[in-house]
């Protein structure tokens, strides 16, 4: 159903930008000069086409084709994606080569007021997302380092990190979530005291900053989508975020989920960590009370007609981080899994003889609205977490960023199936505040 729906959207988009005369293509520009033959563009690389007659409202669309090793279907294709235009004059148009697709021959279509003209074709290199799990580190205003704010790639095979993009002095990127397969990072983009949705496209290497102001935090929904939690007056609204800006497809927004804030609660207390959605529809958030305590906060998403916010008892802690894992559905063995949520409760950085480890990993019990007993602990205080669950469920891991005693922070991996911890890099030394 999902694939059919997307193809329908693409078809409607193309229909809206096609000539009424099927036999004759309109001449929208003249004297077209394409890039040199044989040039292969990287995804996100600037492409300039020269011609006479470009107009301010012109748009670029793509017809992307790539070969398939298939006896029936010899060619894969994607139609209808809109280009990211970076510069436009009366005699030239510059846009970013499309990403996220296999190496392709891409036809460039000029779209104007319901008419479409082919400008020519270019070759584009492979821009597909890696199949393996990818981990990224975020240096932002919460990082205890003098290094510039940036996004870095963390190599999981050997001790190596690579800077992906650096932020300007007046920019910040926080509450970052990574939807598997999208090859993009979504988070809260802060600039000039405005908090909006920021998305960094890892295939095309560019920023997309869209959405309304008053963004509180971000989260990943159970239906493989990203959502933002926005403030509107005395309510919180949950809105789906399009993590495929490179397609420029119109995807209708789902109805807003309006949650009335409890009396005395300000939305900004929920802005410390990303939130997560469980299979029951509820959304787990964390409230920083500003007095050395945190409170579990649950947005009740089970009944959209009676939306409510539950606030748990304050917990003395330095961190209360929502996380998710999967568990087998009762009575079905490992045939079916459900997503459950919980909180990482960090009371201090380090273990004590009297109280034990400083951090506990505890699942949330929706029935009792309390935290279960810890299923694992760690001595250091946690800062951030990322969950890996493979498609066959044979690999289930938590990647956790911990405070260190010196030389930066540590990343440890908890194997949920084996119940064991392992250091990602011996010695640590990471400058991140989020992973």
What are these regions (language model features)?
Residues 13-16:
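C-terminal motif of bacterial Sec signal peptides marking the signal peptidase cleavage site
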Residues 18-59, 68-79, 115-129:
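Beta-strand/beta-sandwich contexts
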Residues 77-82, 86, 122-165:
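An edge-strand/N-cap motif at the start of beta-rich repeat modules
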Residues 143-153, 192-199, 234-248, 290-298, ...:
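Structural motif
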Residues 156-159, 201-205, 241-243, 251-254, ...:
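Short loop/turn segments that connect beta-strands within beta-propeller blades
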Residues 160-168, 205-212, 216, 248-267, ...:
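A short beta-strand motif characteristic of beta-propeller blades
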Residues 169-182, 212-233, 262-279, 312-337, ...:
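Repeated scaffold domains used in trafficking and secretory/extracellular systems
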Residues 403-435:
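Blade-level signature of beta-propeller repeat domains, shared across WD40, Kelch, NHL, RCC1
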């Amino acid at each position: 159903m999902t694939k059919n729906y997307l193809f329908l959207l693409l078809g409607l988009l193309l229909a809206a930008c096609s000539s009424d005369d099927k036999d004759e293509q309109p001449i929208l520009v003249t004297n077209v000069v394409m890039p040199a033959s044989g040039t292969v563009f990287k995804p996100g690389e600037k492409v300039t086409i020269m011609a006479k007659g470009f107009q301010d409202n012109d748009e670029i669309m793509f017809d992307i084709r790539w070969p398939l090793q298939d006896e029936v279907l010899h060619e894969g294709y994607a139609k209808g994606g809109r280009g990211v235009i970076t510069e436009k004059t009366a005699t030239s148009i510059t846009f970013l080569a499309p990403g996220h697709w296999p190496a392709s021959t891409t036809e460039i279509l000029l779209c104007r007021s319901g008419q479409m003209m082919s400008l020519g074709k270019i070759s584009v290199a492979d821009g597909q997302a890696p199949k393996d799990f990818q981990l990224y580190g975020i240096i932002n205003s919460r990082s205890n380092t003098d290094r510039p704010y940036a996004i870095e790639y963390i190599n999981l095979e050997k001790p190596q990190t690579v800077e992906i993009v650096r932020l300007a002095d007046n920019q910040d990127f926080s509450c970052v979530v990574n939807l598997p397969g999208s090859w993009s990072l979504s988070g809260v983009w802060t600039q000039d005291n405005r908090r909006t949705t920021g998305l960094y496209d890892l295939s095309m290497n560019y920023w997309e900053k869209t959405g309304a102001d008053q963004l509180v935090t971000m989260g990943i929904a159970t239906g493989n989508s990203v959502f933002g939690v926005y403030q509107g007056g005395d309510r919180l609204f949950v809105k789906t975020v399009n993590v495929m800006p490179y397609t420029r497809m119109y995807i209708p927004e789902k109805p807003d989920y309006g949650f009335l804030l409890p009396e005395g609660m300000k939305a900004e207390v929920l802005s410390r960590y990303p939130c997560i959605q469980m299979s029951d529809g509820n959304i787990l958030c964390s409230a920083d009370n500003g007095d050395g305590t945190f409170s579990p906060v649950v947005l009740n998403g089970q009944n959209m007609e009676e939306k409510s916010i539950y606030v748990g008892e304050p917990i003395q802690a330095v961190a209360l981080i929502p996380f998710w894992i999967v568990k087998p559905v009762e009575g079905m063995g490992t045939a079916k899994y459900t997503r459950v949520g919980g909180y990482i409760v960090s009371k201090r950085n380090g273990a004590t003889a009297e109280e034990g480890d400083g951090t506990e990993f505890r699942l949330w019990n929706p029935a009792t609205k309390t935290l279960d007993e810890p299923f694992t602990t760690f001595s250091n205080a946690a800062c951030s977490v990322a969950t890996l669950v493979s498609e066959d469920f044979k690999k289930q891991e938590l990647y956790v960023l911990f405070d260190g005693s010196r030389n930066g922070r540590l990343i440890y991996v908890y194997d949920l199936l084996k119940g064991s911890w392992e250091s990602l890099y011996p010695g640590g030394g990471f400058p991140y505040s989020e992973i």
